[in-house]
Amino acid sequence: MRKYPLSLLKDKNIVTFFDFWGKTRRGEKDGGDDYHLLCWHSLDVAAMGYLMVKRNCFGLADYFRQLGISDKEQAAQFFAWLLCWHDIGKFARSFQQLYLPPELKIQEGARKNYEKISHSTLGYWLWNHYLSECQELLPSSSLSPRKLRRVIEMWMPVTTGHHGRPPDRMDELDNFLPEDKAAARDFLLEIKPLFPLIEIPAFWDDDEGIELIKHLSWYISATVVLADWTGSSTRFFPRVAHPMDIKSYWQKTLIQAQNALTVFPLKAKVAPFNGINTLFPFIENPTPLQQKVLDLDISQQGPQLFILEDVTGAGKTEAALILAHRLIAAGKAQGLFFGLPTMATANAMYDRLVKTWLAFYSPESRPSLVLAHSARTLMDRFNESLWSGDLVGSEEPDEQTFSQGCAAWFADSNKKALLAEIGVGTLDQAMMAVMPFKHNNLRLLGLSNKILLADEIHACDAYMSCILEGLIERQARGGNSVILLSATLSQQQRDKLVAAFARGTEGQQEAPFLEKDDYPWLTHVTKSDVNSHRVATRKDVERSVSVGWLHSEQECIARIESAVSQGKCIAWIRNSVDDAIKVHRQLLARGVIPASSLSLFHSRFAFSDRQRIETETLARFGKYCSLQRASQVIVCTQVIEQSVDIDLDEMISDLAPVDLLIQRAGRLQRHIRDINGQLKRDGKDERSPPELLILAPVWDDSPGDEWFGSAMRNSAFVYPDHGRIWLTQRVLREQGAIQMPHAARLLIESVYGEDVVMPEGFARSEQEQVGKYYCDRAMAKKFVLNFRPGYAANINDYLPEKLSTRLAEESVSLWLATCIDGVVKPYATGAHAWEMSVVRVRRSWWKKHRDEFSLLEGEAFRLWCIEQRQDPEMANVILVNDDESCGYSATEGLIGKVG
């Protein structure tokens, strides 16, 4: 090892590791010197990692215990030593030339242009092509030098790949000069004595040890990211540009790391499960499903899968949370993530959980509840719940209120949001954990030791279902339980879900074959067993909704006007936005229904208007509204299916797949009311028996290819599987009603069962749909990570251009703005005004209608892009005013040309 005496440090011709910077000011006013030496930043991050193990943050000490290092001090020293390697790629001359402070001996060389390679990949290359041969750098072990190098090789991607993806493996690279390599070697040799207790376990080179390291590398690599993030904060680690003794700086940065550790909220203490009333005081008598999960034997070791299939009103959500609390209280998890199909359903579930979730933990604990989806910052209730994680452990704890909240540290990034004890969000946020998205390892860490609770899983298409199966398999392999909720699943769907769990547990479990009257149903799968349970049904959730048929829009309009004349509230659920806008205009033009009694709700509204309309919809049609519901009409699209708890006297729906019609019918006479619409506590509903009227093509026993498209062109585009649409109409005509729960399985299997027979007229389209089904699943499988190689170089291509959790058409964001006297302002007012002014539409729709709008252009647009940090190539700002000809109105939304 080269020692660096003062004379050497002052020699302008000799480069030492004190001549390499790691962080710069980058416009930050405070934070210490102009730059931070690379050696000090490396030790800052190492100190964070050392203390994270000592405190068992995110289960780090538990992971090392699984790896055979049960002594916390020894494990902490190994992790700190490993973190000293995380930025060795920054010793590259190509990186150092990005910033050349005059005090350092590295000056601008003759060569200025280097291939752009991340310092993560540079560091991994330096290990493979130089440092791996420096035996003196490696910890002690009983393993031979060759085997020890092979073991450390597995850990190098974990530490160098700390920017959200593993490093790339490269062979030809000339970004390092010889003195750069020597400085990196000298630094790593200098820090080695700081960690005298490290001893590499010999079994790490066994097949079992290698497999375990690869499995845990996904989680440990995420903690490297967290150590680097916090270790880079100048709030705790101010920049230091001058050399000093390594041991002295290590002691100094350990003290700083103690303070930085307070950004991680303390692990909450779980409360015992003391019965259903602790969680839900309003439940006097559990539903049969809730009683079933109360009685269920959950004592088996290892992960468990629960599939709860029951009707609307059976208390599935409460049953799932009861089950989750029982599992958490039994030490089988520390928290849960509740995944829902849409942002609207996630927002609604967040509101419900706010009243319940603290009961999962002891009163003195301070757990976090996080809303995780891309627009969560626009939800006022969530923003009000934030408390600063930085203040935990401060000298003013009495200033912090012990109410529900979520650590700001968790909330400032969707990447970290899943790390909170309780998460609520779109299922996509969890699915991204098993796909090659950047920082997927942070999501995996967040889901570790958590129950995955997914609702409305019947709504997943072939692509999403395949990714969900990959997520279930990964959760099971990690020893985590899964709870799935659905109205009804087909046998094929259930088979695939159970098979995914079985792969994760390396078992042979198979889903039971269910008959058409096996409903409601609870499927319980463990590592070695499958148990099925029939669930009883309460009389008050047994319902029969008769089905009627309409064959023209004129018939539908007449039925709406008739309902209004009788003082009833009614909805028409259309399959396309354009159809909804068109019929809304027709109803207004006829003048029979006053504009004040007519609502329009679809997806092409700005976020601010959409929130307003949803609030108004609940006020008019919600559970507790009575007088204001009379003679009210809402024309809407699929946004109404899952997002809001509304109760309608009558309903018309465009023909759609049977599972969606069942979902829509759930909004028809949802709560018990008297003849005047007043809510009743119990007894019979006094309104006319519920009837779902369906606008559909005239029935044809032998339909042709154009059967659906010729009658309902827009609906045919939205739901291209016309054979399933025809099967839906057939089974509903045969049954004459939607009878729940008795006919639920029959309805689903009659449309989605593997043995259904399609008419000859749909032969070509059916072949196309079957081909699309397998193509979509194949694409999803391509995007689900193969975790077996571990967090390693070149395991998958990260961030492919079209990577998405959903195989829907790409959408674009449009910003609405006003421009008065040259001043550009957002359409919305209040907090997050620009975000609340966004409308999202299909890219093809925008391409077709773009020329119908006035757009912000020129210098004003350029300045807006700079201010809002938007890409000018991607951003679109629509100028709006009070004139509806501008293409947007608060009443109709983004219009375009509606036929």
Which ranges hold each PLM region?
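Accessory nucleic-acid engagement/destabilization modules that flank
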Residues: 2-271
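Conserved pre-motif I regulatory segment
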Residues: 273-309
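Walker A/P-loop
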Residues: 301-324, 460, 486
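Conserved Walker A/P-loop ATP-binding site and its immediately adjacent core
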Residues: 335-357, 369-380, 489-493
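A substrate-engagement module of RecA-like helicase motors
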Residues: 353-421, 427-431
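Post-DEXD/H (motif II) to motif III coupling segment of the RecA-like Helicase ATP-binding lobe
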Residues: 445-451, 458-533
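C-terminal helicase lobe and adjacent C-terminal extensions/tails of nucleic-acid helicase motors
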Residues: 494, 544, 554-625, 648, ...
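Conserved interdomain linker/interface between the two RecA-like ATPase lobes of SF2 helicase motors
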Residues: 505-580
